[in-house]
């Protein structure tokens, strides 16, 4: 089954040439973006890496997202890319994995890695084959044009989380460890924005707690801060999955808010790019 884009023309341009140019500008942005384009991919990814990557409209979060993809290129071309995104629509299964076929963007199609999907499904107590959770969801889709831009051809495992509980994060981390055994060069993207629709000062404070938990690679602290500080982070389950894995290092690459882009600091959304390896 081919998944058609749900948010082309909304979150990013629907025309190929315009999309390529906007992604280029995300990388070349010197104020919030990294200010340079990624170099050529010179090697194969040898060990798993994780990215925390935002998923708003490219005009707002694209320059922050560019930091993560720029860094990922330095590690090498992945054998498969797992993209874990939160379910914003309420449709589908609690943990829905798109099982087969391909996903289309204005830059072309990317195949679903059916062998990798099989490994995840057979080693998870929660993950289920599901199309419905993905049909209208944007959080996974918006990562794919960036992947196509920096790597060209990749295969993916799309996982959409309505259930973002600690139990699911631990379960998925365990299933992904099995995947790593067969696909050592896996890139795992946790698609998330941070605090939503509060003023700049409040969002910077709340986001700092999330960054602290990520830097400490502490999933329990992440969940504690979410509740204690009332943080409206949308994709915490994917981030907690990364924090439950056996990564040894983490680097915070960039944090900004929508207010840094628009100048409106009354109601902002926080964006973070980080890499785990």
UniProtKB/Swiss-Prot annotation:
Disulfide bonds: none annotated. Coiled coil: none annotated. PANTHER family: PROTEIN MEMO1. Belongs to the MEMO1 family. This is MEMO1 family protein TM_0087. It comes from Thermotoga maritima (strain ATCC 43589 / DSM 3109 / JCM 10099 / NBRC 100826 / MSB8). The lineage of its organism: Bacteria, Thermotogati, Thermotogota, Thermotogae, Thermotogales.
């Amino acid at each position: 089954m081919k998944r058609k884009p749900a948010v082309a023309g909304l979150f990013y341009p629907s025309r190929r040439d315009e999309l390529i140019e906007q992604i280029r500008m995300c990388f070349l942005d010197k104020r919030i973006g990294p200010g340079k384009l990624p170099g050529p991919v010179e090697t194969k990814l040898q060990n798993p890496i994780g990215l925390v990557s935002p998923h708003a409209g490219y005009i707002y979060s694209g320059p922050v997202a560019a930091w993560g993809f720029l860094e990922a290129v330095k590690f090498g071309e992945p054998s498969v890319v797992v993209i874990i995104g939160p379910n914003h629509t309420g449709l589908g299964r609690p943990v829905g994995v798109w099982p087969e076929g391909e996903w289309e963007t204005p830059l072309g199609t990317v195949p679903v890695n059916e062998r990798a999907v099989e490994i995840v499904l057979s080693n998870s107590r929660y993950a289920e084959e599901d199309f419905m959770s993905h049909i209208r969801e944007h959080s996974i889709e918006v990562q794919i044009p960036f992947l196509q831009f920096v790597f060209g051809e990749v295969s993916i495992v799309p996982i959409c989380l309505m259930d973002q509980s600690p139990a699911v994060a631990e379960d998925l981390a365990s299933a992904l460890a099995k995947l790593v055994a067969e696909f050592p060069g896996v890139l795992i993207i946790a698609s998330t924005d941070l605090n939503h629709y509060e003023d700049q000062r409040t969002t910077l404070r709340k986001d700092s707690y999330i960054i602290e938990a990520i830097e400490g690679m502490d999933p329990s602290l992440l969940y504690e801060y979410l509740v204690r500080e009332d943080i409206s982070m949308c994709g915490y389950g994917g981030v907690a999955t990364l924090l439950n894995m056996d990564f040894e290092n983490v680097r915070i690459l960039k944090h900004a808010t929508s207010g840094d882009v628009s100048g409106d600091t009354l109601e902002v959304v926080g964006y973070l790019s980080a890499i785990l390896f």
